Each structure stands twice: as structure tokens, then as C-alpha cells.
Amino acid sequence: MSEKKYTFETEVDKLLHLVIHSLYSNREIFLRELVSNSSDAIEKLRYESISNAALNEDDTDYAIRIDFDKDAKTITVSDNGIGMTEEEVIENLGTIAKSGTKKFLESLTGDKSKDNELIGQFGVGFYSSFIVADKVTVRTRKAGQDKSQATKWVSDAQNGFTVETITKEKRGTEVILHIKKEHLDLLEYHVLKGLVNKYSDCINTSIQMKKVEYDKDGKQTVKDEYETVNNTKAIWLRSKDEVTDEEYQEFYKYISHDFADALMWIHNKVEGNLEYNSLLYIPQNKPFDFWNRDKDYGLSLYVRRVFIMENKELLPPYLRFVKGVIDSADLPLNVSREILQHNKVIDKIKKAITTKILSELKKLASKDKEKYQKFWDSFGQVLKEGVSDDYSNKEKIAGLLRFATTQSGDSKQTVSLADYISRMKEGQDTIYYITSDSYKAAANNPQLEAFKKKGIEVILMTDRIDEWMMSTLTEFDGKHMKSIIKGDIDLDRFETPENKEKFEKEAKDFEKVLKEIKEVLKDKVEDVRLSKRLTDSPSCVVVNDYGMSLHMQKMMEEAGQSFMPGMGMKPILELNAEHNLVQKLKNEADTEIFADLSELLLLQAMFVEGAKIEDPMAFVKLVNKYIR
């Protein structure tokens, strides 16, 4: 059959250009990526042949072979895995199905060191072949397909690709790389074997190369017999003392396609009523598309060394950054994704590894604060999801949280709740916090004034998830969690008798004027009262203890969510009795000026709080009216 010519989709063209011109210094990854693809193809066949043994075509000696030909200047990576149909070849090699590709390409900066890190987080897979090859040929036949229905794919990465139907005796895929002249040094046994041992030694499939013998003069002879050149015992089944740190790191890079080392790993063997082996990794950095909700995540599930699937059910969503494998002997080989969603063994494994991960993070936080801080900076926001999502582990997760505070000095989130408690003032039984859009907005919020004056530390929460998190985190270690922008603030125990008496006197003096202000603002506020929060600013707005904060209301509106009846409550206006503007208002006889100043005190408090101003122009006109 004659060949058909195709063009690459736009994203592939861009990615190919990027790979060829930006990754030349990381050329070694091509073999890791091709071996990884072959391994995946074999694992798919292993799994599918459980229910359809005919797919094996009487060949169950699964292997990946690496050959090189100095005369032809080629390297060939072949496997006897599942193979591909013509449609799959066009889809897998001519388009990029991976979501987030466009965003990834747009995020590149032009700085090669930064871009290489991004590329590593993205994973370039098959296209890394073009780092070392100026032409790539793929010959493949799907398992179970007729020998005459195989497919050949050819591309030079410049002019699209061609596809034609060919005959191929054996199922599986072979990738033939026509090596560029500047990379001909790769055409050596010791070089290719070295790359296998460096990047793919722990792969769960035999990687084979033709035997090489040397005579007494060091002359090399390549035999026709193949030998296994990797350690085929799965790394997660080996004991910890058999595995070097380098092997752990290379296996992480193999399964994650990350260029950077893992931050830490957890290697565990569980025996008893439930038996499984696990090797879990926590990366150093979050991938560029980490917040993409459509992105797949999950651990690789094996049953007795047979890869089953990437499975989300093995991890709670708030631990989706964890990479690794679980190998269980307590599941059937023909288990389906639907069965896994309601499987008691999976539920038990999930519970156990969740507990283990949280325990290891606690140890890390205690033993290596700098390393834990790196983890927190990358994954702290997603870990916070667990406070609301995982009630049984809420206290453990809360102990891992880190925050900026009024005493930490900057926006870096370094303070734990235990740290906060250890610094509480004598007589303090409440953990105080404030939520806001940004660190500066939180740190400069007028409602902190009384706390700062009394030396009471306040946690500054500025992540979008914090409001949701704090709706369920109401106490920690027996201490009540209190938002300083909700309800009354009782700081009387830290006040002198003189100040208490002074406030009571002011409350009586202002009783009449507060009622008058409330009447003026009756459609806009729930109440007007004197503030125990303010020392320098004239006014602030709060909500009652059970109301939705103005910050939360704003976020919901921005997300296009409507309020249920009673949710979007009117604020409470608090006034500083000692401020000149409030004193002026108290003594103002002109009803128009009185109304204007009342409105102004409310609007500026709303503005500082970041709340929505319904009519910004009216606010500006009001300010301009009283500028002297």
C-alpha cells in the first residue's frame, strides 16, 4: 500500500522545535523515554492477555531489546508489547493528547535552564528521539492483528510524517533512530548499557542487548546472543539495604519523567492480614500543570508485579502530588477500574499509605526544617485541602500546616500551629487568625491594631483555600480558632482596669450617635458599634460569628456563585471612639454632613477589607467632596 503523508498538529511542531533546540544538553533522556514507552506497552499486554491469552501469540518472553549498527548509524529499541494500529500511530505520534500542552508551551520563558526544568516536568516522551536522530522510523503491529496489517511511520521532524501499511512478523513496536553525526559516539555497547543502568536499571522488564566479548588485545566482538543488562527485580520488591540512593532517584525520574531528584521517598513492606509493597516519592517541585483539574494523577498499581493501571483511588486528592507504586498480592489480576472504586483491599491500602505519608511528613518537619519548608512551599496549598476532605486525619494535617504571622516578619509561611501555641500570651486560650487576598493586605489590616498593641500574635492567611479550610478547622490541640474579622473580640483579660472603665464610658457617650448612624446606614449594615479592635484607624467592618466573611463573599462572587438566602449577610460597622473623624461625626449637627461622614466611614472600611463597592464612582465623589 502506498504511503500517506500527514502534517503534525501545531503543538507537536512547537514541541519538536523545542526538544531539538533546547534539550541537546540532556540527550541521554531519549533512551529512558523509549524504554519507558516499551515497558508501558509490555505492561498493557500483560494485563490484557489475562482475559485474552491469544494476544500473546505464543510468546510470553516479554523483553525490550536495544540494538545498534555502526555502519547504518542507527539505534533500534524494540519490544514485544501491545503494539499499535495505524489509527493509534497517527494519534500517538502525530498529535499531543496530553492536556495542558498549550499552557505549557505558553509558559516557556526563553531561559534555557528554566525551560529545561519545565520540559522535565512536562515529559517529552517519544519526541526526545529527535534530540539525537535526524530521522525516526517506527514499525509496529498491534497484538492480535494480522501480520499484513502492521504500520510504518517515518519522520525527519521537519516535514510532517508518512504512514504506510507493511507486513511485520512479530507483534510489538520497534523504533529506529538514524543518529545525527554529532551523536555517533552513542553507537557503542558500553555507552548504551551505561544509559540503561543509569536510567532504567530497575524497570520491571528484561532489557536486552547482544553480548559483547573482548579478546586479549581489547578487540570487541558482538555476538548474536542477547543478554539481560538491567536488574529486572522490581526495586520496590527489594529490601531497603539493597537499594542505593542513586537507584531510588533514578527510578523516581523513570516513573515521573522529572529531571530533578525527588525530595524524599518512602519504601515500605507490609505483611499480615494485608500484604503489599510500596515505594512512594514526594517531588521537589510541583509540575507546571499541577492545578489542572483534568490532569490525571495516582499511583501505579501492580498485582503480583503485573501493572494494572494508574489509580486515583489509592490516594486522597490532597496527596495527589505523591508519585510511586503499590504492589499487592491481595487483588485479582483481572480487577477492573470500576471494582477498584468499591474495593475493601484498596480502601485499606489507601488508609494505610495515607497514614504513612502524613507520619513521614511529620518526621521530616521535625528532623529537617529546611527540607520540609521546600515541601511546604511546593505543596502546602494542596495539603490544606485535606483539612476539609479527610476528617479522620484532620488533626494530623493541621499539625503539618505552616503560616505567616504578625511576628514572622514576612510572607514566608514558616510558623506551625504548635509554634503559635508555644508563644501564646499568659491567659490566652484562643488561636487568632485573619484571612485576606494578600500578605500586605492582611498584615496592614486595621483589625490587627489592638492585637499588635497587646503583643498578641495573629496568623495571616492569604491562600484562596484558607477560608474553606477554616470552616472546618475550628480548634487545634484544645485551642479554639478565632477569626478576628468575625463577631466580638474579647481581649478584656489583657486590658487594664482603667482602659475597661474608659471603654464603658465611651460606649455610654456614643449610644445615641451609634443609633443615628445605624439609622442612616440601615439598608447597608446589620449593626453599628464601638470597636475593641481599633487603635489608630477610624472604622472597620466585621460579620457576626456565623456569617460569611466579606473576603469569602467576594471570592464566591468572583467564582460566579450565588448566595443562598442569609449567606451574604450585611456587615457590622465598628468605630474607633478616639479617632478625630469619629469625634467629628459625634459632634456634627448638619444632617447632610452627618450622613455623608457615616457613609464615608463605612465605604472606606469596606474598601480596606477588599469588599465589593457597589458604586465606586459615588465613593470617589464622596471623598472628593470633603477633601480640603
Curated annotation (Swiss-Prot):
<keyword id="KW-0963">Cytoplasm</keyword>
<dbReference type="GO" id="GO:0016887">
    <property type="term" value="F:ATP hydrolysis activity"/>
</dbReference>
<feature type="region of interest" description="B">
    <location>
        <begin position="338"/>
        <end position="554"/>
    </location>
</feature>
<comment type="similarity">
    <text>Belongs to the heat shock protein 90 family.</text>
</comment>
<dbReference type="InterPro" id="IPR020568">
    <property type="entry name" value="Ribosomal_Su5_D2-typ_SF"/>
</dbReference>
<dbReference type="GO" id="GO:0140662">
    <property type="term" value="F:ATP-dependent protein folding chaperone"/>
</dbReference>
<dbReference type="GO" id="GO:0051082">
    <property type="term" value="F:unfolded protein binding"/>
</dbReference>
<dbReference type="InterPro" id="IPR001404">
    <property type="entry name" value="Hsp90_fam"/>
</dbReference>
<dbReference type="InterPro" id="IPR019805">
    <property type="entry name" value="Heat_shock_protein_90_CS"/>
</dbReference>
<comment type="function">
    <text>Molecular chaperone. Has ATPase activity.</text>
</comment>
<dbReference type="GO" id="GO:0005737">
    <property type="term" value="C:cytoplasm"/>
</dbReference>
<keyword id="KW-0067">ATP-binding</keyword>
<dbReference type="GO" id="GO:0005524">
    <property type="term" value="F:ATP binding"/>
</dbReference>
<keyword id="KW-0346">Stress response</keyword>
<feature type="region of interest" description="A; substrate-binding">
    <location>
        <begin position="1"/>
        <end position="337"/>
    </location>
</feature>
<dbReference type="Pfam" id="PF13589">
    <property type="entry name" value="HATPase_c_3"/>
</dbReference>
<dbReference type="InterPro" id="IPR020575">
    <property type="entry name" value="Hsp90_N"/>
</dbReference>
<protein>
    <recommendedName>
        <fullName>Chaperone protein HtpG</fullName>
    </recommendedName>
</protein>
<dbReference type="InterPro" id="IPR036890">
    <property type="entry name" value="HATPase_C_sf"/>
</dbReference>
<comment type="subunit">
    <text>Homodimer.</text>
</comment>
<dbReference type="InterPro" id="IPR037196">
    <property type="entry name" value="HSP90_C"/>
</dbReference>
<keyword id="KW-0143">Chaperone</keyword>
<keyword id="KW-0547">Nucleotide-binding</keyword>
<feature type="region of interest" description="C">
    <location>
        <begin position="555"/>
        <end position="628"/>
    </location>
</feature>
<dbReference type="Pfam" id="PF00183">
    <property type="entry name" value="HSP90"/>
</dbReference>
